[in-house]
């Protein structure tokens, strides 16, 4: 009898098409889905030049134009890669015992590999909004439940989406990891398997992530303007903190819809043309309620199978799609001109 698919099944690999992985990765992560991708980031680093000033040899007086001339202002960010790993470990007996519809609802290999892909995806999607430090939350309150357990309340409840049962955490500068035993997603509280030694206001990291993660929007568009000691991928952005480090607009004293229009006007003043604004679901709900019957919804399509529902607002340089993203920090909106943003990776990410 010839070797056939039935007898050789144990040696065959589970096949994942690019389309399947894309669907798993993008469906709940709008910014990750919508940002342009460059997947050939080889070599040691990548030089990203930016022109932030034009020649200043100009005057109504020729002699002054000549004597005051300057060259164009250029700086180059030197990008480097970050690694991130997600492991799926499956005992061979489990793989064999779960094969076929009669033996299990889901084959073990598919179940666990899908989970690892989702873990890597969540890490990347969260990091795209981060500053590179790896912080996924801040301790708001801490209580020792027993001699061997700590109950941690997050400073921002909405950050609870960044945490999972079984996750190993570090707090502040400590390198001893503690595991999450249980989570209350309504209150932003989780219980650890041991006393953490953490204090309030300390940042929280997945074990091994501190200062090792991709630099996302919070790094490229910092909430505080870069100062004289700034060094960001080899660039001191303080020479023009707006053109090299983005625009900061404080709309905390304004109604949300007015804050967004004000931010759009501020970006337009600097020559930008924002077309998408990412916000947290909590803030998106506030915007829906504030607009009431005036709300105008828009569907943002990434491909025929993946799309997101947003709200359309009108800025001074055109319509802006406000899209909710669970990975965006609460109380922060990122208003972007999408054609100037790109995710660089060595192969597909994740």
Which stretches of residues belong to each language-model region?
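Core alpha/beta structural scaffold of self-assembling particle/tube/pore-forming proteins
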Residues: 1-57, 68-70, 76-89, 93-350
């Amino acid at each position: 009898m010839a070797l056939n698919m039935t007898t050789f099944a144990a040696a065959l690999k589970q096949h994942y098409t690019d389309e399947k992985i894309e669907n798993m990765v993008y469906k709940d992560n709008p910014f990750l889905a919508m940002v342009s991708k460059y997947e050939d980031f080889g070599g040691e680093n990548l030089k990203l030049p930016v022109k932030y000033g034009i020649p200043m040899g100009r005057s109504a007086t020729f002699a002054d134009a000549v004597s005051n001339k300057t060259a164009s202002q250029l700086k180059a960010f030197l990008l480097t890669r970050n690694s991130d790993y997600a492991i799926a470990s499956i005992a061979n007996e489990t793989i064999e015992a779960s094969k076929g519809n009669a033996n299990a609802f889901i084959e073990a290999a598919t179940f666990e590999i899908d989970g690892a892909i989702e873990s890597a995806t969540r890490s990347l999607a969260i990091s795209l909004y981060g500053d590179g430090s790896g912080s996924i939350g801040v301790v708001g309150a801490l209580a020792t439940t027993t001699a061997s357990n700590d109950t941690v309340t997050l400073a921002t409840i909405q950050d609870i989406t960044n945490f999972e049962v079984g996750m190993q955490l570090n707090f502040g500068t400590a390198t001893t990891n503690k595991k999450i035993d249980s989570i209350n997603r309504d209150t932003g509280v989780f219980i650890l398997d041991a006393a953490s030694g953490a204090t309030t206001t300390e940042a929280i990291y997945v074990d091994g992530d501190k200062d090792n993660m991709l630099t996302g929007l919070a790094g490229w568009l910092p909430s505080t303007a870069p100062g004289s000691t700034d060094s960001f991928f080899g660039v001191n952005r303080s020479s023009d903190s707006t053109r090299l480090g983005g625009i900061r607009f404080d709309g905390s004293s304004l109604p949300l819809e007015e804050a967004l229009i004000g931010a759009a006007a501020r970006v337009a003043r600097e020559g930008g043309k924002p077309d998408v604004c990412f916000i947290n679901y909590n803030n998106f709900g506030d915007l829906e309620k504030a607009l009431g019957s005036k709300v105008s919804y828009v569907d943002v399509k990434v491909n025929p199978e993946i799309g997101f529902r947003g709200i359309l607002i009108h800025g001074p340089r055109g319509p802006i799609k406000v899209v909710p993203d669970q990975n965006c920090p609460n109380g922060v909106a990122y208003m972007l001109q999408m054609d100037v943003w790109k995710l660089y990776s060595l192969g597909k990410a994740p």
